[in-house]
Each structure stands twice: as C-alpha cells, then as structure tokens.
Amino acid sequence: MAVYATGDLQGCLEPLKCLLDRVAFEPGRDRLWLTGDLVNRGPQSLETLRFIHGMRDSVTTVLGNHDLHLLAVAHDIERLKKSDTLREILEAPDRDLLLDWLRWQKLLHHDGERGIVLVHAGIPPQWSLKKALRLAAEVEEALRDDSRLPQFLDGMYGNDPLRWNGRLRGTARLRAITNYFTRMRFCTADGTLDLKSKEGLGSAPSGFTPWFSHPRRKTRGQKILFGHWAALEGHCDEPGVIALDTGCVWGGALTLLNLDTGEYHRCACDGAKGDAG
C-alpha cells in the first residue's frame, strides 16, 4: 500500500488521472490525500467530484473555501460568481449524493500513526494541534447537522473577526475558525489575519508573516501538508511544512507526493483564467 497526497484540483481532472496512472494507483490498495478545493475554476468540476466520490473509500480529503462555496450556492445561500464553474454540479442528477458526501468531509485531518496533518490553508500559530482539531470539529458538526447547516453557510462569508478570541460565540466563532483553516495565508504571531494578500512570500504586508513561519508556532514539530497558496509554487522553506498547491488551475502543475518515499511527481496543466482565491 502507498499513500499519496496532492494539492488543489479545482476541477482539473485530467492531470490527476495522469499522475495516478503514472504511479499505478490502485483504489482499495493505495490511498489518496487531497488538500481540498476539489472543484471550481477548472473545466471539469462535476467530473472531478464524481471521480473522487467514486473512489471515496480510498480518499482522505479536507474541505477548501471553494468546496464550502459550492455548498452555499447549492443551498441558495450564495449566488454563482462569474468565475465559478459549478453549474454542472448544481444541475446534475446525482448532485444531492455528491454534496451530501462533501459536507461530511473534514476541515482538518491528523494521521497519528504517520504523524502527518492535512489542512487546506493552514493552522494559525497560536493553536496547538489538539486545539485545532477541537475547533475544526465545531465547524464539522455544523456542516453535518441539517438544522444548523443553512445558518452556518449563510454566516461563513466575511473577514471579521480577523483575530481569534476564545470568547467568540455563534456565527462569528465558526466564521473565524473556517477562515483560518480555509483562507489564511499571512498572519501575525497572535493570529491576526490578512485576507487580502494572495501573492508569494515576498508580498507579506508590514507586520505579517506566512502562518507557518512564526518562530513560536505551536504546531512546530508536526508535519503539515497544505494547499490553497498557489503563488508559493510548492516552496515554503519551512522544515516539516509541505505546500502542495502548485497552481494547476492557473496553468502550473499538479503535484503528487508519495508520503512513504518522499518522491514527487508532477503533471503540467493547461490552466484557467481568473484571480487566485
């Protein structure tokens, strides 16, 4: 058995198939980890979601901001944006099956045996892994509860609060947790977010640092796999932290990492036009 991890697919199915064929991936024997953002902006969002769902017993995925956006649009909370490529999913006969599976996925995955954490955007420096898992579970519970789901989806949009406070309650609390796990790039040592800057390491606003670079980050010593930040092009220069989003949907490449051997495989992508997010 081999375990592989790959970055944001965003509806780019053919590069994933290329990589899985290259390593002779066999569902049922091997496992595939995904950093989230399975859909949107790419040309095959429906086909990608169906493909992943079809081998769901061999897949571990976390949710990204585009996956959550899909759920919000599907529940008539949010409208489709011009750059969205989600309409085929919304009109598909199996949409309910696919979307119900999607909302049961995690925000944060920890493989204790391997000592590896999987997340879409990152873990803020002021949270320990134990605390991060506990807070992720709060959002996961809201997503899986039919009575709470619409309120959560309606409240998750927005940047405030930009800083975590344990006294936060209700919608603001869940929004803050969601933004850390699915939208974060730069923050201060106390976790204050900058949610506007989307470029590389050199574009940090004054006083802000990439979330993984803070010297006192409480998850130091943990191996963390993350996506979301295509502008890093797979390079974050931080021991134990691995950036897997190499900008497939923007014409970069899709990267597949063998977690057992450390070997990387890449497949070039045609890409789609738009703004990173």
Curated annotation (Swiss-Prot):
Keywords: Hydrolase
NCBIfam families on file: apaH, PRK00166.1
Catalytic activity, EC: 3.6.1.41
InterPro entries according to UniProt: ApaH, Calcineurin-like_PHP_ApaH, Metallo-depent_PP-like
Pfam families: Metallophos
UniProt entry tagged with the keyword Isomerase: no
Disulphide bonds in the chain: none
Keyword Hydrolase tagged: yes
Record HAMAP family: ApaH
Gene behind this protein: apaH
GO molecular function, one term: bis(5'-nucleosyl)-tetraphosphatase (symmetrical) activity
Function field: Hydrolyzes diadenosine 5',5'''-P1,P4-tetraphosphate to yield ADP.
Catalytic reaction annotation: P(1),P(4)-bis(5'-adenosyl) tetraphosphate + H2O = 2 ADP + 2 H(+)
Protein's name according to its UniProt entry: Bis(5'-nucleosyl)-tetraphosphatase, symmetrical
Family affiliation: Belongs to the Ap4A hydrolase family.
